[in-house]
């Protein structure tokens, strides 16, 4: 399909604006990677835009230009989500709906996780009640896992030093190192923890945040198995120290993953 840079009446449309934006981002802002995040239905427009920009010399071969398309949010009937009046549903509307089922922080996490875990180009049904559940593949489930690990570490810190500040930064404490991995649950958890950097690199390169969500869900599940099969606070000696280090690493990775 052709790209109309200038209209017959002399005016300029979106195509010209997009080309000018690329020229400025590369020439003035020195961008080496440009990412557009819009409705997946605009994929063809950006395919043509990038081709024309390269032909015009605005987009050199050593500058990456990518379009990340996202799907639609659907209502319970499987159709595009609309207000009762038939208008477009805003993010604040979705947050208000989620907050009828959970506290604001949990509701926000639930929506963000549900949106990112689905795979950007896929449509998904907005179900606030399901999104705020603390079981299954949801944001609140990961928040709960992070809170549970934190509780264990705070108990361990209090046992070691009764005068420790209950609000102390757990990440700033020295939890030793992971040195004993005799149990299968310990081994599986440690293996997943070792893959965090690899997963983040893949997500950043391929622009696939759902892969990070899948990883964090698997990590939370592996920690749950570890928690059930490998007592932490009831263990002693080197085993206890190693398991506390595993807990600290799990908390750190879950926290950083959720921040991302």
Residue ranges and their predicted role:
Residues 1-260:
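Non-catalytic interaction-recognition regions
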């Amino acid at each position: 399909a052709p790209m109309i840079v200038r209209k017959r009446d002399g005016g300029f449309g979106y195509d010209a604006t997009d080309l000018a934006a690329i020229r400025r981002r590369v020439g003035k802002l020195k961008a080496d990677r440009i990412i557009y995040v819009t409705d997946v239905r605009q994929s063809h427009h950006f395919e043509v835009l990038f081709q024309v920009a390269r032909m015009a010399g605005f987009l050199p071969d050593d500058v990456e230009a990518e379009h990340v398309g996202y799907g639609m949010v659907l209502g319970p009937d499987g159709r595009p989500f609309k207000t009762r009046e038939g208008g477009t549903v805003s993010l604040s509307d979705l947050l208000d709906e989620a907050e009828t089922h959970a506290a604001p922080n949990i509701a926000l996490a639930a929506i963000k996780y549900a949106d990112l875990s689905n795979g950007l180009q896929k449509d998904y049904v907005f179900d606030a009640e399901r999104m705020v559940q603390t079981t299954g593949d949801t944001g609140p489930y990961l928040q709960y896992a992070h809170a549970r690990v934190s509780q264990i570490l705070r108990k361990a810190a209090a046992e070691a030093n009764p005068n420790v500040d209950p609000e102390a930064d757990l990440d700033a404490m020295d939890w030793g190192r992971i040195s004993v991995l005799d149990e299968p649950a310990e081994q599986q958890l440690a293996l997943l923890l070792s893959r965090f950097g690899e997963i983040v690199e893949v997500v950043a390169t391929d622009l696939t945040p759902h892969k990070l969500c899948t990883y964090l869900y698997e990590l939370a599940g592996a920690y749950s198995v570890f928690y059930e099969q490998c007592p932490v606070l009831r263990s002693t000696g080197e085993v206890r120290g190693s398991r506390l280090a595993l807990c600290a690493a799990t908390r750190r990775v879950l926290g950083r993953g959720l921040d991302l």
